[in-house]
């Protein structure tokens, strides 16, 4: 059995399936992740029926040729209490998607990008919509514009909004991302001082995301992010 403290609050290079197999049941409070959709975006440059910007060098790996095996999803549900999985609509044969509380991310796109994305959640409730501009050069927070290092990178600000709504700051459990990619989940957690673990099997993406995380962790904070989050949630 793996000591979870050995991989906590950092990004680990490796196969997430092998990591999860060494974790006990329900040791993760929330999984917030974005697995490969199996639509071969590295070759086609397309997501759904729309073209994605392909100008940046996002790495040589053909990481999106296949959907992860069902065993990955079985292990994710075994080790975690709750799950938020982007692209859940692509994984209908891999997991139980009987959920009323799906997330819709409206990107406010006007170009050739996919106008929105879906995320499965295991939570009760109604559909939740988040609007966060992510359209080529345009981003919601232009003052803190993110460098895009991954084709399906999720904006940190969006993930922080999702965490504010779904993560129980008073319980203080661990958030995990087993398909870490650009490291956005790890960074969002670090900015909130939420305990996290992240796993990425591509060495290229691992190195780039590690730099992003270290840069974020180097930022000086006046207040504990977790205390701020608790205060906000307790006022609801």
Where are these regions (language model features)?
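Class I S-adenosyl-L-methionine
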Residues: 23-32, 37, 41-59, 77-236
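Short hydrophobic/charged patches on amphipathic alpha-helices used for structural packing
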Residues: 17-20, 73-74
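Short, conserved SAM-binding segment of the class I
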Residues: 68-75, 79
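A short acidic, glycine-rich active-site loop
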Residues: 55-70
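Extreme N-terminal starter segment of soluble prokaryotic enzymes
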Residues: 6-10
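Conserved SAM/SAH-binding loop
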Residues: 14-18, 226-229
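Blade/loop signatures of beta-propeller domains
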Residues: 1-4
């Amino acid at each position: 059995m793996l000591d979870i403290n050995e991989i906590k609050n950092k990004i680990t290079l490796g196969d997430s399936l092998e990591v999860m197999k060494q974790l006990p049941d329900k040791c993760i409070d929330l999984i917030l992740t974005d697995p490969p959709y199996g639509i071969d975006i590295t070759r086609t440059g397309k997501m759904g029926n729309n073209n994605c910007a392909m100008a940046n060098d996002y790495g040589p790996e053909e990481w999106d040729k296949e959907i992860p095996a069902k065993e990955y999803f079985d292990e994710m549900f075994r080790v975690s209490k709750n799950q938020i999985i982007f692209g859940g609509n692509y994984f209908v044969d891999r997991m139980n998607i009987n959920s009323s509380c799906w997330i819709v991310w409206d990107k406010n796109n006007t170009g050739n990008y996919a106008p929105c994305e879906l995320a499965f959640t295991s939570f009760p409730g109604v559909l939740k919509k988040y609007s966060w501009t992510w359209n080529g050069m345009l981003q919601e927070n232009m003052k803190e514009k993110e460098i895009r290092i991954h084709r399906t990178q999720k904006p940190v600000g969006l993930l922080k909004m999702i965490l504010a709504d779904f993560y129980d700051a008073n319980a203080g459990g661990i958030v995990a991302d087993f398909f870490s990619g650009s490291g956005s989940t790890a960074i969002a957690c670090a900015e909130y001082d939420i305990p996290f673990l992240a796993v990425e099997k591509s060495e290229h993406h691992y190195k780039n995301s590690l730099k992003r995380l270290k840069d974020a962790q180097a930022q000086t904070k006046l207040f504990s992010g977790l205390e701020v989050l608790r205060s906000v949630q307790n006022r609801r």
